[in-house]
Amino acid sequence: MFVIIKSAKKTPAGVVGYWERDWDDQKVWEVGWSVLPDYQRQGIVTAATRLLIAFVTKLKSHRYIFSYPSINNNPSNAICRKLGFTLIGDRNFEYPPGKVLHCNIWRLDLLQIS
């Protein structure tokens, strides 16, 4: 996880992170983010995730990055769209434990990143 810092005051605005997971019998990256309400809708997460994608691409360890925002989380789905992810479906996930969350499945092919 990385803390997203806003401005020269070094104010934390949110977090963005990546981790390894299994998807259809292959290792992939999953990316996720959270931003504090005062910093939403400013492009901060899009910019931070773009930097994270560049970092992960250089690792050359997995072909895909996935993201699983709730189908009702329009801002997070828009971030995936802006960053070139492809919507490949939806699925129910248990998150947090004990709660079912209906999520979109977004995939970014790192081989297509120039």
Feature map (PLM): residue ranges:
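Acyl-donor (CoA/ACP) binding surface of acyl/acetyltransferases
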Residues: 1-114
